[in-house]
């Protein structure tokens, strides 16, 4: 593939607390704000905006107050008129869109890095929306090269930005960082350190790119979600009647084949994988997905070829 010249990136917004009980991002944003107060903006080589996304939920150490804010950034929700009955998170999403966007406009911030934790054994997972955002994919490739403490994986949702519903979709480029396993309402030092390294390396890549470094092309392994799987439920009460099978628990990104165990019913029976196509489970037994009726996602592994990139000179 031919080299691609891209405009310089004006900076990055690092956002934590979009879910108020995912504490690595909350404390990392607070630490970055402390460093800025102590050392000034020169503490980073590029402009960095820090945002505590959902302050009311952070204060109460809850995922959200009224509704999941990370589902409030679609074009339709951002354009919904605000009334007295509007959920807090819809109001806050529109505030953030005004601050960091507007979404799909030339005035939107160049990059958002939104910080999340998961109770699933996902390691460090980078989530974004397209297979053709070369800047974001190069950052993912850079992190995969530099971080060795945990596996670094890329998850692509591949939907139009207008339909994209999470905070990072407000920016021209952007991705969310998921690090786990970590219980909600808890901060683990090892998970915090991994998240901080990912943010530091993102800032480092942007600085090098803006300074003229040529980043060679290559392949990036990614996972694209195909479907979601609910827990087995009682047909009348809809209550769970099985849990994730011990042989599947904590094995996010493994390859599921027909006949592999998925669930263990509370009466002792094993529910097996019956799909013909082998797929990879993600976000296995994520605490926050119980209310969404999701035991795990199933994804297909894909290989994306990306071109060399360098900054476009004036």
From Swiss-Prot:
Membrane topology listed for this record: Peripheral membrane protein
User: Could you tell me what reaction this enzyme catalyses?
Assistant: an N-acyl-aromatic L-alpha-amino acid + H2O = an aromatic L-alpha-amino acid + a carboxylate; an N-acetyl-L-cysteine-S-conjugate + H2O = an S-substituted L-cysteine + acetate
Q: List the disulfide bonds.
A: none
| Cellular component, GO, one term | apical plasma membrane
Pfam families documented for this protein: AstE_AspA_cat, AstE_AspA_hybrid
- The UniProt record gives the binding positions of Zn(2+) as 19, 22, 116
**Carries keyword Lyase?**
no
Cofactor (UniProt): Zn(2+)
Cofactor: how bound? Binds 1 zinc ion per subunit.
Q: Per its record, what are the GO molecular function terms? A: aminoacylase activity; hydrolase activity, acting on ester bonds; metal ion binding
Question: Taxonomically, which superkingdom?
Answer: Eukaryota
The enzyme class is hydrolase
Its keywords, alphabetically, are: Cell membrane, Cytoplasm, Hydrolase, Membrane, Metal-binding, Zinc
Q: Which CDD domains match?
A: M14_ASPA
E.C. designation(s): 3.5.1.114
Annotated localization: Apical cell membrane; Cytoplasm
Q: How does it assemble?
A: Homotetramer.
- Biological function: Plays an important role in deacetylating mercapturic acids in kidney proximal tubules.
Q: Name the family.
A: Belongs to the AspA/AstE family. Aspartoacylase subfamily.
Protein name according to UniProt: N-acyl-aromatic-L-amino acid amidohydrolase (carboxylate-forming) B
């Amino acid at each position: 593939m031919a080299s691609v010249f891209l405009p310089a990136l004006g900076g990055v917004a690092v956002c934590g607390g979009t879910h108020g009980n995912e504490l690595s991002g909350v404390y990392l944003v607070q630490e970055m704000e402390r460093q800025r107060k102590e050392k000034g903006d020169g503490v980073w080589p590029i402009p960095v905006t820090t945002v505590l996304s959902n302050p009311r939920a952070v204060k109460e150490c809850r995922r959200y107050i009224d509704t999941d804010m990370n589902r409030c950034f679609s074009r339709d929700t951002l354009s919904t008129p605000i009334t007295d009955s509007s959920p807090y998170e819809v109001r806050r999403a529109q505030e953030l869109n005004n601050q960091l966007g507007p979404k799909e406009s030339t005035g939107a911030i160049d990059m958002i890095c939104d910080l999340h934790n998961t109770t699933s054994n996902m390691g460090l997972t980078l989530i974004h929306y397209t297979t053709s955002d070369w800047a974001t994919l190069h950052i993912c490739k850079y992190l995969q090269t530099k971080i060795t403490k945990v596996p670094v994986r890329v998850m692509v949702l591949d939907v139009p930005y207008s339909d994209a519903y999470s905070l990072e979709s407000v920016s021209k480029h952007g991705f969310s960082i998921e690090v786990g396993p970590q219980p909600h309402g808890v901060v683990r030092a090892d998970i915090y350190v991994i998240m901080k390294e990912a943010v530091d390396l993102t800032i480092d890549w942007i600085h090098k790119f803006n300074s003229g470094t040529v980043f060679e092309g290559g392949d990036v392994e990614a996972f694209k979600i195909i479907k979601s799987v609910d827990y087995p439920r009682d047909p009348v009460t809809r209550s769970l009647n099985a849990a994730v099978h011990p042989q599947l628990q904590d094995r996010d990104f493994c390859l599921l084949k027909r006949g592999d165990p998925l669930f263990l019913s509370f009466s002792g029976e094993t529910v097996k994988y019956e799909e013909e196509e082998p797929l990879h489970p993600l976000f296995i037994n994520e605490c926050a997905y119980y209310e969404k009726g999701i035991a795990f996602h199933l994804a297909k592994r894909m290989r994306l070829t990306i071109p060399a990139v360098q900054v476009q000179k004036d």
